[in-house]
UniProtKB/Swiss-Prot annotation:
Pathway(s) this gene product operates in, as recorded in its UniProt entry: Isoprenoid biosynthesis; isopentenyl diphosphate biosynthesis via DXP pathway; isopentenyl diphosphate from 1-deoxy-D-xylulose 5-phosphate: step 5/6
Family to which this protein belongs: Belongs to the IspG family.
Record bears the keyword Protein biosynthesis: no
Species this protein is from: Oryza sativa subsp. japonica (Rice)
Reaction catalysed by this enzyme: (2E)-4-hydroxy-3-methylbut-2-enyl diphosphate + 2 oxidized [2Fe-2S]-[ferredoxin] + H2O = 2-C-methyl-D-erythritol 2,4-cyclic diphosphate + 2 reduced [2Fe-2S]-[ferredoxin] + H(+)
Protein name per Swiss-Prot or TrEMBL: 4-hydroxy-3-methylbut-2-en-1-yl diphosphate synthase (ferredoxin), chloroplastic
EC number in record: 1.17.7.1
SUPFAM superfamilies reported for this sequence: Nitrite and sulphite reductase 4Fe-4S domain-like
One biological process term in Gene Ontology: response to bacterium
Location, primary (coarse class): plastid
UniProt-listed Pfam families: GcpE (PF04551)
Length: 744
């Protein structure tokens, strides 16, 4: 980190001669030791900005302080309620003739992929998007020629009776923004590159005067656009991207959510200084965990500042297909469950009109949750970390003396996948083993990298069904857990099975009818009374908990009930692993299943709450449910079982056919778990936006590709025809390549 002066104090902290004070009533937590993450100088003494070990929020310490004295740090409010989904109150921002804010529906939008200079093609694309039901359409405007074309685009659409508001996407071009503000309804600016130079990822040092001069430069460059938007009644989005922060911001705050927030606040303060309030914020990242943290931190700051500006939600470079939908659902859905978000965009490497349907499904999910106003009884939340990730430590199964089978593999340390298996599947054991993604050797199953960890069998085969029982024995022998209801285990006992019990059965003592030492899995909803939850304290053989609320049930908010359950477990020192179990209704739409799982389970896993997932849907393919489960864990940055792709959705800047190239690269590299590859259409969303990708394939010029290792370019100007092979060779050169598995 650079040494200098903090550009602005944390808004919830007031420094006094006698120590530290807080400007509002807050909930406090004690911190005994605080590792500094940023050192800044001031005329009032030394200030350390650090991370609270219990809350994840920023805290401050002033010298002198007695050695070892605890700090009091605030737990910041970041949403209206932690007990239910209650939409955050935001002001109305007018985008053309469409109002945006909490008094209005969640707006949906996308972005064109055509060359903006091609007026006819862009108009056609906007019309297709509008016909699908989008509220806004964003168009890239990178230069004067594109800005001039925008006037013709707008006029042509109006002549065709398409009055959908148009948004100009601006990078590096303040003069272009001024021009297009005369015809488009909204201007998106990226604080990381609107006035600052392109990031070189350099460590910079600033004095107080240096930093102030940088802020004055930003104000000088940005103010004319603010005045132009006021003059023409335009809206604005101050849209920070995790991967395109300026060197100045990164030198102070790192490549972090805090840096994203501060970057946006610098621009917002200029807007407010000029009495311009028709703007929204966004905090996008390709990593859903980072994205969620940044939005929450921004809202916490707005609560402290008394601001009520709306939020545009999005996970940038989400990718394509179910992967892209899942990643978007985790990030956007988590925030919608918190009541945050006024407009959303699902960024997919697909035709832009294809983004509208998943976007609408997500918006409906958030609206439905807020309209129901269901939750749980108020409880005191002390342990969940809102602003940074630290996974709760669930105790994996330990081997007990005298046990004949190894239970240590029934759950995976990085996140577990459980699947529901039917009796019919036991009739074809080898097919079942393959469905569970087990590796077969002479017909015998063995666990592999992405093998299901445990299965739920609601009905056991008859004791005399030797073939079915042998199939189950072979699964138990490879440390795959077999969960079955207590009633089944009592009437048709399966050796070494894990009995599934509910709270009533625990209360009645029915589980004591099982042989001593039988392992248990307990199903809970999360809204049980504390007296019922106390039953967990007296049972020694609990291997895991299943948090299970039927999907679509309107009596309990799943996310909030789970948070209450985890708070109880942490408060009472109970470290049972918790599996998130969702049973979807029949005929559920696939996109609804992916989005529902991503939003409801992702909202917990991004906070480190949970140890695995069990998805059930009677009429969905077994392999689809299995793959969706693994995608969910990987999207939450837990268990990595396949290649991770950071793939931009394409826009008018894109220098090659992203969908075609992305498909080619995936076909040849999808078998590399632990490897992350960025596929970026241009340099604007290139090195910075690649975030933590290991390798990058980036459009550098028409027909030419640049290859990156991390954020460093290592090869330039490779012809498109050989670029994919060059990427593979680069992966090999860095020792990350393995040959694809041979089909049996």
């Amino acid at each position: 980190m650079a040494t200098g002066v903090a550009p602005a104090p944390l808004p919830h902290v007031r420094v006094r001669d006698g120590g530290i004070g807080f400007t509002r009533s807050v909930d406090f937590a004690k911190i005994l030791s605080v590792p500094a993450t940023l050192r800044v100088g001031s005329s009032r003494g030394r200030v350390l900005v650090a991370k609270s070990s219990s809350t994840g929020s920023d805290t401050m310490e002033l010298e002198p302080s007695s050695e070892g004295s605890p700090l009091l740090v605030p737990r910041q409010k970041y949403c209206e309620s932690i007990y239910e989904t209650r939409r955050r109150k935001t002001r109305t921002v007018m985008v053309g003739n469409v109002p945006l804010g909490s008094d209005h529906p969640i707006r949906i939008q996308t972005m064109t992929t055509s060359d903006t200079k091609d007026v006819a093609k862009t108009v056609e694309e906007v019309m297709r998007i509008a016909d699908k039901g989008a509220d806004f359409v964003r168009i890239t405007v990178q230069g004067r020629k594109e800005a001039d074309a925008c006037f013709e685009i707008k006029n042509t659409l109006v002549q065709k009776n398409y009055n959908i508001p148009l948004v100009a996407d601006i990078h590096f071009a303040p003069t272009v923004a001024l021009r297009v503000a005369e015809c488009f309804d909204k201007i998106r600016v990226n604080p990381g590159n609107f006035a600052d130079r392109r990031a070189q990822f350099e460590q910079l040092e600033y004095t107080e005067d240096d930093y102030q001069k940088e802020l004055e430069h930003i104000e000088k460059v940005f103010s004319p656009l603010v005045e132009k938007c006021k003059q023409y009644g335009r809206a604005m989005r101050i849209g920070t991207n995790h991967g395109s922060l300026s060197d100045r911001i990164m030198s102070y705050y790192g490549d972090s959510p805090r840096g994203m927030v501060e970057s946006a606040l610098e621009f917002a303060r200029i807007c407010r200084k000029l009495d311009f309030h028709n703007f929204v914020f966004s905090m996008k990242a390709s990593n859903p965990v980072i994205m969620v943290q940044a939005y929450r931190l921004l809202v916490a700051e707005m609560y402290n500042l008394g601001w009520d500006y709306p939020l545009h939600l999005g996970v940038t470079e989400a990718g394509e297909g179910e992967d892209g939908r899942m990643k978007s659902a985790i990030g956007i859905g988590t925030l919608l469950m918190d009541g945050l978000g006024d407009t959303i965009r699902v960024s997919l490497t697909e035709p832009p009109e294809e983004e509208i349907d998943p976007c609408r499904r997500l918006a409906n999910l958030g609206t439905h949750a807020a309209d129901l106003q269901i939750g749980v009884a108020p409880f005191e939340e002390k342990h969940r970390r809102y602003f940074d990730f630290q996974r709760r430590s669930g105790q994996l199964p330990l081997q007990k003396e005298g046990e004949e089978v190894d239970y240590r593999g029934v759950l995976h340390r990085d996140g577990s996948v459980l699947m529901s298996v039917s009796l019919d599947q036991l009739k074809a054991p080898e097919l079942l083993y393959r469905s569970l993604a087990a590796k077969l050797v002479v017909g015998m199953p063995f666990k592999d990298l992405a093998t299901v960890d445990s299965i739920l069998l609601r009905e056991l085969p008859p004791v005399e069904d030797a073939q079915a029982r042998l199939a189950l024995k072979r699964l138990v022998d490879i440390s795959m857990g077999v969960l079955t209801p207590l009633s089944e285990q009592l009437t048709k006992p399966l050796p070494h099975a894990i009995a599934l019990v509910n709270v009533d059965e625990l209360s009645s003592g029915a589980h004591k009818l099982l042989p001593e030492g039988t392992r248990l899995a307990v199903t809970l909803r999360g809204d049980e009374s504390y007296e019922q939850l106390d039953l967990l304290k007296g049972v020694d053989d609990i291997t895991m908990l299943l948090h299970s609320v039927p999907y679509g049930e309107e009596k309990t908010g799943r996310v909030h009930a789970a948070r209450r359950l985890f708070e109880y477990l942490e408060t009472n020192g109970l470290n049972f692993p918790v599996i998130h179990h969702i049973e979807f209704p029949k005929s559920v739409n696939r996109d609804d299943l992916v989005i529902g799982a991503g939003a409801n389970v992702g909202a917990l896993l991004v906070d480190g709450l949970g140890d695995g997932v069990l998805l059930e849907a009677a009429d969905q393919e077994f392999e689809f449910l299995r793959d969706t489960s693994f995608n969910l864990l990987q999207g939450c940055r837990m268990r990595n079982t396949k290649t991770e792709y950071v793939s931009c959705p394409s826009c008018g800047r894109t220098l090659f056919d992203l969908q075609e190239v992305s498909a080619q690269i995936r076909e040849k590299t999808s078998h590399l778990p632990g490897v992350s590859i960025a596929i970026m259409g241009c340099i604007v969303n290139g090195p910075g936006e690649m975030a933590d990708a290991d390798f990058g394939y980036v459009g550098g010029a028409p027909g030419k590709i640049d290859l990156y290792v991390g954020k460093t370019v290592v090869q330039r100007g490779i012809a498109m025809e050989g670029a994919t092979d060059a990427l593979i060779q680069l992966i090999k050169d860095h020792g990350r390549w393995v040959d694809p598995p041979v089909e049996e």
